[in-house]
Amino acid sequence: MLGECHAHLMMNAVDYQRAVADNARAPREDLVRGFLEEYRRLGISFLRDGGDRLGASRLAKELAPEYGIDYRSPIFAIHKAGHYGRVVGFPFETMGEYRDLVARAKAQGADFIKIMLSGILDFDRYGVITSAGLPVEEAR
């Protein structure tokens, strides 16, 4: 079995701005099916997606069985307002808002919860993270 363990299917791996524009109104089923068909053609039968805020990951999860793909997704990521994560999910400010987002992910069929604990690596500056991490007391 071949698997992809950190995908963001919505991002298309080519042009992020175009990917967002393509899915802005609603996830494009033709594009999602095209990606799933390519994974199948390559012999990939397991895909762990990181989610997105536009719904492409949710649609892919629904369609993947047609392609023989075991597709796991958080549907979307959860991040602290003002911190890294807007690209792939929704923000929270209070623990009540966090709980609401967890319930929303569960209701939409999430296989796991993805919470952004830190920024990402700054590829222009060695060893630098793009934003401060979530405070330890909130991460618990």
Give names to the regions the model predicted:
Residues 28-38, 91-105:
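Short, acidic/polar
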Residues 18-20, 80-87, 121-126:
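A short acidic, helix-capping loop that chelates divalent metal ions and anchors anionic groups
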Residues 3, 71-81, 86, 94, ...:
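Acidic, metal/ion-coordinating pockets
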Residues 23-24, 87-93:
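The substrate-binding groove and active-site-proximal loops of carbohydrate-active enzymes
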Residues 61-77, 129-140:
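Alpha-helix-loop-beta-strand connector modules within alpha/beta enzyme cores
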Residues 2-62, 84:
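Metal-associated gating/positioning segment near the N- to mid-region
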Residues 29-58, 68-79, 110-124:
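Divalent metal-dependent hydrolysis catalytic cores, especially in the metallo-beta-lactamase
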Residues 96-117, 121-140:
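Histidine/acidic residue-rich metal-binding segments in metalloenzymes
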